[in-house]
Amino acid sequence: MILLINSHVKAAGKDHILSVEQAAELEDVDCIIVLGCQVRDVGSLSHMLRDRLICGMEVYKAGAAPKLLMSGDHGRVDYNEVGAMKRYATQNGVPSEDVFMDHAGFSTYESVYRAKEVFEAEKVIIVTQKYHLYRALYIAKQFGVDAYGVSADLNTYVGQTMRDFREVLARC
């Protein structure tokens, strides 16, 4: 049953995963959602988050959408994914006014829900690693969001086998 559900979620999203160039050809996209990921104690980015931001900024600079929505965990004073994300984007040429921050994107579900219900996004491009994109796109479809994804797999990541296993279970 788990494998059947996993296959269904992957099949539902595979045709919506695009290259940066394909994403730039979409019309009327409200924003590019960059999903949060771990930041270290001093606020430095994990490799996965840095790659998500690099890809998100590339999609933005290609003209795919007018705004970036950084969605991540800022549930504690001493932990701020979205602050680190915005800082990285603005230090790399994205105007501050083009970066929105969702401080309550504690999960993929919450990030997509809040993009629609709080930020009123109807058509989005989601940027995260490919293993994660399938579920993000599936959730967006369930909320009625017209969503496309761009994979941020710029590197090989330590612990990916465990993340892949966890993701299969998360899709159920």
Residue ranges and their predicted role:
Residues 172:
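Carbohydrate-recognition loop of C-type lectin domains
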Residues 1-4:
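Hydrophobic membrane-insertion alpha-helices, especially the h-region
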